[in-house]
């Protein structure tokens, strides 16, 4: 019989985009939860992984794989979850839980839906490593900046009319077609008061025009892109001819060009929403939606997959054709991507629920002042908890375990647990229920 609540050791990934040394929150937490881990101040630490994904699986204190332990003790996953998710019978969790520390921008990317994931896995298993989809949710731990989906079409059109370096890659007939579909003029100079963002969903015709615009930019000749970006950067550095609609994007374009000189992703500041999340705010990214994390520390939860289709801001393989063909081409204000938390339990404001519209996971955020307690109702599936601030005690029946910042705790299915803060506590708990 296995205990229902126990600590596990996560894995840590070092990628170039991670924050360096002790500046990385992922690395700070790893010093507690990964045996013999010490921070190298010259190394970038990007991700703390919690879960059963084979690329960096979590382990128990005796070094047993968490997946092996769960396979031997299926009651920890619970029968309803095992019935719903076939892989759970092998001890796999249907979600992957992470802490990300982002120092430089990640690639402009999207994740495939299930049918496309299977097709890509069948055709290119060396690139796309599994046949699963990867919807994901990000919760800000520090101020977090990201590209999230396409701009409202009226705003995107204004950029097409005013940014000469963008105009080089988009045929004027596409700009005219987009303007016509929106009932907006293309006269110069544009009357900016007409180009207000709206939440009206894009029509099929507008989505097709947007697809052609995005394809034209992302597949443009590399040398021509570099020359256009060089002109843009010189213009911005000289603070010359900057239109009102460009002003908020200047610093970001300069920063992205510093990180990825001459990369087509720099021009995506004119196509994608730039969204800043404050601590505790969350965004949900469904399949086939373009995004790129730019800076900050986040909690991230996703379906168990490592599939990424990239097309910009990256030295890695770019699969432009796949990305262009797969996107939904929804276009709306960035706040449409935000996910509002709700109380997890009536009358308890210590724990908020982030509940995206998918089956594989939900996430709780619990905050307790020193000496406070809260109980979480039994969850009919497995949970992973990471302590991001403070220290305390968790109780399950007669079992009691102390924890500190950085600890990662597994909670088995169907168990009520009580949390008590010894020091002001912040904890995130990812779980699945069927």
Swiss-Prot record:
CC cofactor: Zn(2+)
Localization terms from the record: Cytoplasm
Active-site positions on this chain: 310
Pfam families: PMI_typeI_C, PMI_typeI_cat, PMI_typeI_hel
Biased composition (Polar residues): 181-191
Reactions it catalyzes: D-mannose 6-phosphate = D-fructose 6-phosphate
Keyword field: Cytoplasm, Isomerase, Metal-binding, Zinc
InterPro entries xrefs: Man6P_Isoase-1 (IPR001250), Mannose-6-P_Isomerase (IPR016305), Pmannose_isomerase-type1_CS (IPR018050), PMI_typeI_C (IPR046456), PMI_typeI_cat (IPR046457), PMI_typeI_hel (IPR046458), RmlC-like_jellyroll (IPR014710), RmlC_Cupin_sf (IPR011051)
SUPFAM superfamilies given in the database record: RmlC-like cupins
EC numbers, comma separated: 5.3.1.8
GO-annotated cellular components: cytosol
GO terms for MF: mannose-6-phosphate isomerase activity; zinc ion binding
Positions that bind Zn(2+): 109, 111, 136, 291
Biological process, per Gene Ontology: carbohydrate metabolic process; GDP-mannose biosynthetic process
Main location: cytoplasm
Cofactor details (free text): Binds 1 zinc ion per subunit.
Pathway: Nucleotide-sugar biosynthesis; GDP-alpha-D-mannose biosynthesis; alpha-D-mannose 1-phosphate from D-fructose 6-phosphate: step 1/2
Region described as Disordered: 181-200
Function: Involved in the synthesis of the GDP-mannose and dolichol-phosphate-mannose required for a number of critical mannosyl transfer reactions.
Similarity annotation: Belongs to the mannose-6-phosphate isomerase type 1 family.
Protein name per UniProt: Mannose-6-phosphate isomerase
Organism for this UniProt entry: Cryptococcus neoformans var. neoformans serotype D (strain JEC21 / ATCC MYA-565) (Filobasidiella neoformans)
């Amino acid at each position: 019989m296995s205990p229902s609540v126990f600590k596990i050791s996560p894995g840590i990934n070092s990628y170039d985009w991670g924050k360096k040394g002790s500046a990385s929150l992922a690395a700070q937490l790893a010093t507690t939860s990964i045996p013999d881990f010490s921070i190298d101040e010259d190394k970038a630490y990007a991700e703390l992984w919690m879960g059963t994904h084979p690329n960096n699986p979590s382990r128990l204190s005796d070094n047993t794989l968490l997946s092996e332990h769960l396979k031997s003790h299926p009651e920890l996953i619970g029968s309803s979850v095992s019935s719903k998710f076939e892989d759970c019978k092998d001890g796999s969790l249907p979600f992957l839980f992470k802490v990300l520390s982002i120092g430089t921008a990640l690639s402009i990317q999207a994740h495939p839906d299930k049918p496309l994931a299977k097709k890509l896995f069948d055709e290119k298993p060396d690139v796309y490593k599994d046949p699963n989809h990867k919807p994901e949710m990000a919760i800000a731990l520090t101020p977090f900046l990201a590209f999230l989906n396409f701009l409202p079409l009226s705003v995107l059109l204004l950029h097409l009319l005013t940014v000469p370096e963008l105009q080089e890659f988009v045929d004027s007939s596409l700009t005219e077609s987009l303007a016509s579909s929106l009932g907006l003029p293309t006269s110069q100079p544009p009357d900016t008061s007409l180009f207000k963002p709206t939440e009206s969903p894009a029509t099929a015709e507008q989505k097709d025009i947007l697809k052609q615009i995005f394809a034209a930019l992302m597949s443009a000749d590399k040398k021509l892109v570099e020359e256009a970006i060089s002109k843009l950067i010189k213009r911005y550095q000289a603070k010359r001819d900057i239109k009102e609609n460009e002003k908020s994007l200047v610093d970001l374009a300069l920063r992205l060009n510093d990180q990825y000189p001459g990369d087509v992703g720099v021009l995506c500041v004119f196509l994608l929403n730039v969204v800043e999340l404050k601590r505790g705010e969350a965004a949900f990214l469904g399949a086939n939606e373009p995004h790129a994390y730019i800076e900050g520390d986040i909690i991230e939860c996703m379906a168990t997959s490592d599939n990424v289709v990239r097309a910009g801001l990256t030295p890695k393989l770019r699969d432009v054709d796949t990305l262009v063909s797969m996107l939904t081409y929804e276009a709306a204000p960035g706040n449409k991507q935000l996910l509002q938390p709700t109380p997890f339990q009536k009358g308890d404001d210590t724990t908020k629920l982030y509940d995206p519209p998918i089956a594989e996971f939900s996430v709780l955020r619990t905050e307790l002042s020193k000496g406070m307690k809260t109980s979480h109702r039994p969850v009919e599936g497995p949970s992973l908890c990471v302590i991001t601030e403070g220290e305390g005690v968790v109780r399950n029946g007669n079992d009691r375990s102390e924890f500190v910042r950085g600890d990662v705790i597994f909670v088995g299915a169907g168990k009520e647990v009580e949390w008590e803060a010894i020091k002001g506590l912040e904890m995130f708990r990812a779980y699945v229920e069927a």
